[in-house]
């Protein structure tokens, strides 16, 4: 169970860093938002899901 928690935390951190870099780049590009809107929403949905997963796994471990 601890390994699953650690992997979920790592995935959350990695997703956060990717979104931290990619979202401003998408907004700064001239036609970025209209062409990459689905990618940003998918990344945000993944991030929210990982937040809940880490919370659930944390409650099971401690």
Curated annotation (Swiss-Prot):
Question: Which SUPFAM superfamilies does the UniProt entry name for this protein?
Answer: PsbZ-like
Q: Quote the Pfam families the UniProt record gives.
A: Ycf9 (PF01737)
Q: Does the keyword Thylakoid apply?
A: yes
InterPro entries per UniProt: PSII_PsbZ, PSII_PsbZ_sf
Please tell me where this protein is predominantly located.
plastid
In the bilayer, the protein is annotated as: Multi-pass membrane protein
Q: Name one GO cellular component term.
A: chloroplast thylakoid membrane
- Which GO terms fall under biological process for this protein? photosynthesis; photosystem II stabilization
Subunit text: PSII is composed of 1 copy each of membrane proteins PsbA, PsbB, PsbC, PsbD, PsbE, PsbF, PsbH, PsbI, PsbJ, PsbK, PsbL, PsbM, PsbT, PsbY, PsbZ, Psb30/Ycf12, at least 3 peripheral proteins of the oxygen-evolving complex and a large number of cofactors. It forms dimeric complexes.
The protein here is known as Photosystem II reaction center protein Z
- The protein's gene is named psbZ
């Amino acid at each position: 169970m601890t390994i699953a928690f650690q992997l979920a935390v790592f995935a959350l951190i990695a997703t956060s860093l990717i979104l931290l870099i990619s979202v401003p780049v998408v907004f700064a590009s001239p036609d970025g938002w209209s062409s990459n809107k689905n990618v940003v929403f998918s990344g945000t949905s993944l991030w929210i899901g990982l937040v809940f997963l880490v919370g659930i796994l944390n409650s099971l471990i401690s």
